[in-house]
C-alpha cells in the first residue's frame, strides 16, 4: 500500500538534502524580499475589514422560501422463477417488471406524480420489423392541486380507486407481501378496471376520530380492450364516474375500511353497448402483527335496451404475520381467492372461474430487498382440473 505523504513534507525533505549554506542564504534573501510586501498588507488591512464578503447564495434566501420543482425518483424491480404441474403461464426464470416512480413538488400546493414500467415481452424479436424486448407503459401521470386537506383536485391517469389493493400497492412487487396481485385486480386483467383517465376530487375530514376520506371522479371508460383505459379518448363518449369512501378510525390504529361504486358504459364488438356497475367493499388491518385484508367486488352488466342483467362476483382474504425473531425478517402468509362468472354475463364470457389457495413466506433480506416463496393450488373453469406449482421471487427498491 502506498503511504500518503503531504506535499509540504516532500518539499521539506528536498530542502534538507541541500547544503546548509545554500539553505541559509536562500532564507535571508527571501526575508529581504518579503519585508515590503508585509508592510503593504498591514497598511491595507483596515480597508479590507470595511468590505466584508457577500453572504452565500443560500443565506440570501428567506427562511421559508423553497426552490421548485423538486424531483424525487425511486425504482422497483423483481426477478421470478415458476414451475407448475400443468403448463400455465410463464415457467422457469422470468425477468420481472422494472418500475420508476417520479414525484415532483411544483409549488407549495401543486404536485406531480408519474410511474413508468418496463415489462418483458414473450414475442420479443419476432415479426418484421422485430418487436422490442420490453413494453414501455405510462402507468400513472397525475398533477394535483391542493386547496387544503379537505379538498384536492387532480387530473391524469390513475390506478382506479375502485378497491383497496389497486391504490395501496402500485407497480413494484417489493411493496406488497405476496408475489402477485389478487386475480380480481391483476395488471392486464379484465374483472376490475385497473386504470382510469380523467379528473378526481378527494379529501379527508377528521369527523371526531373517524378520519373519513372521500374520492369522486369522472373520466373515460374502458377501451375496446377491457383491460385498457381510454388513454386516447372515450370509446363511446359516455363518461364513467366513481365514488369512493373509507375510514381510518383513531380508536383502532391500523384499521381501514370502505367501499366504492363505479359506473360505465362498455362498447363491445358489433357496437353492442352494456351498462356496467361495480360495487366493492373492503377491510384492511395493516399492523404486520397481524396483516389482514379482505375484499369483495360485484360487477353488473346489462345490455342497453335489454332487461336481462348478470352479476359476476369475486373476493379474496389474505392473512400474514411478521415474526418477532431474527429482527422481524420473516413474514408467513396465506391467501384464498375466488372469481365467479355469471353464465349470463356476455362481457366476461371469456373469463374462467377461479378458486385458489396460496401459502407463502416473505424474507426481508434488508430494508430494500426481499425474497418470497409460494406454493399455489388452484382450479379454473368447472374445477375438474386442479393445478399446483411453486413460485419464487426476488424483489427490491432503489
Predicted regions span which residues?
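Outer membrane beta-barrel
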Residues: 59-224, 237-239, 246-253, 316-322, ...
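Interfacial loop-to-helix transition and helix-capping segments at the boundaries
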Residues: 230-238
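Outer-membrane beta-barrel pore domains
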Residues: 83-88, 129-133, 142-146, 154-157, ...
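A short secondary-structure junction signal
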Residues: 211-213, 225-231, 269-270
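Bacterial N-terminal signal peptides
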Residues: 31-46
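N-terminal secretory signal peptides that target proteins for export/translocation
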Residues: 1-30
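C-terminal/domain-terminus segments
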Residues: 223-231, 387-393
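Boundary at the C-terminal end of the N-terminal hydrophobic targeting segment
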Residues: 47-51
Amino acid at each position: 500500500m502506498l503511504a500518503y505523504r503531504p506535499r509540504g513534507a516532500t518539499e521539506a525533505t528536498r530542502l534538507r538534502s541541500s547544503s546548509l549554506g545554500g539553505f541559509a542564504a536562500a532564507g535571508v534573501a527571501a526575508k529581504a524580499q518579503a519585508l515590503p510586501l508585509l508592510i503593504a498588507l498591514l497598511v491595507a488591512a483596515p480597508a479590507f475589514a470595511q468590505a466584508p464578503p457577500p453572504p452565500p447564495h443560500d443565506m440570501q434566501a428567506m427562511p421559508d422560501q423553497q426552490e421548485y420543482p423538486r424531483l424525487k425518483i425511486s425504482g422497483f424491480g423483481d426477478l421470478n422463477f415458476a414451475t407448475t404441474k400443468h403448463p400455465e403461464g410463464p415457467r422457469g426464470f422470468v425477468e420481472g417488471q422494472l418500475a420508476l416512480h417520479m414525484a415532483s413538488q411544483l409549488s407549495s400546493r401543486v404536485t406531480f406524480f408519474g410511474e413508468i414500467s418496463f415489462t418483458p415481452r414473450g414475442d420479443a424479436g419476432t415479426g418484421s420489423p422485430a418487436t422490442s424486448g420490453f413494453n414501455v407503459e405510462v402507468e400513472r401521470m397525475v398533477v394535483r392541486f391542493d386547496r387544503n386537506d379537505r379538498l384536492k383536485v387532480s387530473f391524469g391517469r390513475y390506478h382506479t380507486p375502485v378497491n383497496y389493493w389497486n391504490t395501496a400497492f402500485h407497480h413494484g412487487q417489493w411493496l406488497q407481501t405476496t408475489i402477485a396481485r389478487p386475480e380480481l385486480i391483476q395488471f392486464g386483467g379484465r374483472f376490475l378496471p385497473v386504470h382510469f383517465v380523467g379528473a378526481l376530487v378527494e379529501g379527508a375530514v377528521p369527523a371526531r376520530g373517524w378520519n373519513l376520506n372521500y374520492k369522486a371522479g369522472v373520466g373515460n371508460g374502458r377501451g375496446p380492450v377491457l383491460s385498457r383505459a381510454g388513454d386516447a379518448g372515450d370509446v363511446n363518449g359516455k363518461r364513467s364516474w366513481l365514488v369512493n369512501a373509507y375510514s381510518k378510525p383513531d380508536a383502532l390504529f391500523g384499521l381501514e375500511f370502505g367501499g366504492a361504486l363505479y359506473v360505465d358504459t362498455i362498447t363491445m364488438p358489433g357496437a353492442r353497448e352494456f351498462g356496467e356497475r361495480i360495487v366493492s367493499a373492503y377491510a384492511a388491518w395493516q399492523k404486520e402483527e397481524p396483516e389482514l385484508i379482505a375484499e369483495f367486488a360485484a360487477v353488473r352488466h346489462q345490455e342497453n335496451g335489454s332487461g336481462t342483467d348478470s352479476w359476476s362476483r369475486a373476493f379474496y382474504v389474505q392473512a400474514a404475520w411478521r415474526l418477532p425473531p431474527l429482527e422481524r425478517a420473516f413474514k408467513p402468509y396465506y391467501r384464498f381467492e375466488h372469481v365467479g362468472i355469471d353464465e349470463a354475463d356476455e362481457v366476461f364470457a371469456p373469463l374462467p372461474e377461479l378458486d385458489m389457495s396460496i401459502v407463502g413466506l416473505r424474507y426481508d433480506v434488508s430494508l430494500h430487498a426481499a425474497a418470497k416463496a409460494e406454493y399455489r393450488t388452484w382450479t379454473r373453469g368447472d374445477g375438474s382440473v386442479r393445478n399446483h406449482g411453486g413460485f419464487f421471487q426476488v424483489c427490491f427498491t432503489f
